[in-house]
A protein has these predicted regions:
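Small-molecule-sensing regulatory modules
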Residues: 1-32, 105, 110-205
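Conserved beta-strand termini and adjacent loop/short-helix elements that scaffold enzyme active sites
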Residues: 16-18, 57, 75, 100, ...
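Short, structured active-site "lid" loops
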Residues: 27-54
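Short Gly/Pro-enriched turn/cap motifs at secondary-structure boundaries
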Residues: 36-37, 76, 167-170
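Short, Asp-centered acidic motifs that coordinate Mg2+ and/or phosphate
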Residues: 52-56, 138-139
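Short beta-strand segments
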Residues: 57-58, 98-100, 141-143, 180
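A conserved helix-loop-strand patch within extracytoplasmic ligand-binding domains
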Residues: 59-62, 66-115, 166, 186
Length: 205
């Protein structure tokens, strides 16, 4: 994203990585605590306090309403919105799948009615290892865009299968990046917007 801002706007970008509540509480169930806002609050506070000029969010993690003084200025080009079914390569008929998402569970239950569900917390690498090596579940479902951004196309002991959208409808805003800014700088950063992506994500939200 820094490269996009530099190339399109001609600005020098200083990155300010931040850890959010959702990042820090790896043992929380997002469904119990409420997933929306857990990955955004700290970034929004930095914007409002003037410690940052723009915040880069995963669009699917954003609440539908912005805090007073903040707006979404742009949605750059979207990546692949599909979900990926990741299975241990020795598994043909999974019995235990890992996902905390009610959306993913409900849709995949039609394909695998025999499956029981559990949650695997941790980053993507940790979850892949828990399936490939530790066999804590037969598989999981991950976002294709997230795997792509991490450069993960394969993993020893696992198979990756992208699910058609008519079989697994993605989360609203999945694979899209949202740029949030202070309200008085909306026009300044709107040049980063990709019209087709913006229109689709706003309709989904």
């Amino acid at each position: 994203m820094a490269q996009l801002v530099e190339s399109v706007m001609g600005l020098n970008v200083e990155l300010s990585p931040m850890s959010t509540t959702g990042d820090q509480q790896a043992d929380w169930s997002l469904q119990e605590k409420g997933g929306k806002g857990l990955f955004t609050k700290e970034l929004e506070v930095a914007l409002l306090e003037g410690r940052a000029d723009l915040a880069v969010h995963s669009a699917k993690d954003l609440p539908t309403e912005n805090p007073d003084g903040l707006v979404l200025s742009a949605f750059p080009v979207r990546e692949d919105p599909r979900d990926v079914l990741v299975l241990n390569e020795q598994v043909k008929d999974p019995q235990i799948l890992a996902s905390g998402s009610p959306r993913r569970r409900a849709q995949l239950q039609k394909r695998f009615p025999q499956v029981s569900w559990k949650e695997l917390r941790g980053n993507v690498e940790t979850r892949l290892r828990k399936i490939a090596v530790q066999r804590e579940a037969d598989g999981t479902i991950l976002a294709a865009a997230g795997l792509s951004r991490l450069g993960i196309k394969e993993y020893p002991g696992l198979t990756f299968n992208k699910l058609p959208i008519d079989e697994m409808v993605p989360s609203p805003g999945q694979a899209a990046i949202a740029i949030q800014v202070r309200s008085n700088e909306l026009d300044k950063f709107s040049v980063l917007d990709h019209e087709e992506t913006s229109r689709a994500v706003l309709l989904e939200r």
